[in-house]
Amino acid sequence: MPWDQLARQSILLQAVSVWRDDPENWLAGSFDRLPETVRVNPLRSDSEWTEGWLEGIGSERIGWFIGPGSAWTLPFNRGAAEGDIREMLADLHETGRLTRQEAVSMLPAIALDAQPGEVVLDMCASPGSKTTQISEHLGEAGAVFANEVVNSRVNMLVTNVQRHGSRTSVVVHHDGRYIPRVPESGFDRILVDVPCTGSGTTRKNPDVWGKWLPSGGRSLHDLQVALLSRAVALVKPGGRVVYATCSLDPVEDEAVVAEVLRNSEGVDMKSVMELLPDVPGEAGRTDWPSLDDGGGVTVVEIPESMQPPSEQGIASQLPRSMRVWNDKIGGGGFFLAVLEKSEDAPERPAPEVEVKMTAEEVKPDSDNSPRPIPDEVASVVESAWGALPDDLWLRGKRLLLSTPEVHDVWESERSRRGGRTRIPGGRWRPLKVIHLGLSAARLRRGDVERIVAGAAHELAPRLPNASSEVDGDLIDALLADEEMSPDEAGVNAVRGGHILIDRATRDCVSVWVGVRVSLMLGKAERRILSLKRGLSITEKEEE
């Protein structure tokens, strides 16, 4: 059946006919494929160049986007780029200079408004676009714990935070409903972008037309309530929780928020319309009917938590949430609610401590967990680089750059068994940490093998003995695959991993100095640098 016919016969359109007086307008704006939209990474020193490239191909800034960074609508549909533009877009994404992301999915991180130095939780994080956006808000200070419960999606999350190149990310693997309270003091801000039926995603996932049923939202409601409830429990007094779905169904949206407010003290909603004044949204609802799986209004009984709230104190707050309709924003449909915990919100009384474990009594973290760099490795690194960067971690054979706030969480005391057992810090347990920070270098046979290209711009100013300023012509020659000896490059006293800095443009490139000087750049980074510098693009790859 053609998609347009399927859409017109869909249960979803029947439901929207109940929720809106003008369902035909919604349908007209919910069918065409989405435009390609991207977010530019402001943590990269050449972000202005990336923005210039986007302008050059006819892209337009998204007017309602609030930085840091910028967001753009490209002049073609999602996935429809061709030729050199398609290749460069892939390169810019791969190297972390931009992130492909649906425009409406940028809204939650804007509403969260994380500040540098804060400790943030992204409770349902994969594939990671919102995590990387939070990292951009944090800059070089703070931590965002990116949690994912599904094994197969954890790898995708790690890949994306590594690609982005932020020092603040920490990837953890838990069921969000039971994620441990680490740090014990709680999080400054929490994003809860819950699993949902995706009724707002018809332009991205046309299969929704044939699959969506009202019973789907009811089946997810309890999970959504549990995830948001855990977030409210984990956020600090004075902290903020953002609840987000790509669903238009009030059972997954306002009903979830109302149930959490019903069971929480000292928590109130903040107006999303005021936080995002330029977004064409609609105030949340205080009333909605129950729907059967034909999309019609029904009198069948459903649990109280899925019904409109009878409490005036809760109902009066629901219009502070915001629903974004596909046709109003020219993209996907979305729902947002912002909850804030008051400074004097009652905290659950701490139970009496029954056991206080020593470091020796606690099961150690997995060998694969990141840990602060041990003394013996620190000596090797300092010998190789002439200095030891702060906040350096080790995971396997990989050196990672992080932040003081991540280390503070690792050092902090925590508890188990509801607080009855105290555990000393200096570990991640009971938190299961998979990856953190920016990959900086690799070890091989006990020595620092090389500096990872994506970390060169971070490490260069910290490592005067492991970096050299050179004329731009020299870097151009290396990009053009000209053979060069250490003497010709002016690094005759250097062996091993090194960073060359263009003294004019401040471009940083990772090299290996042996018998000759070799660029340690992947194809994507090599192509972008060549384009930036006006060179012909070569296909050689060293990394």
Give short role names for the model-derived ranges:
Residues 1-57, 315, 330-335, 340-543:
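Polybasic, low-complexity RNA-engagement segments
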Residues 117-126:
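Conserved class I S-adenosyl-L-methionine
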Residues 139, 235-237:
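Helix-to-beta-strand junctions that scaffold the AdoMet/dcAdoMet cofactor pocket
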Residues 141-145:
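Short beta-strand element of Class I
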Residues 152, 185-230, 236, 242, ...:
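Mobile active-site "lid"/loop adjacent to the S-adenosyl-L-methionine
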Residues 240, 248-399:
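Class I S-adenosyl-L-methionine
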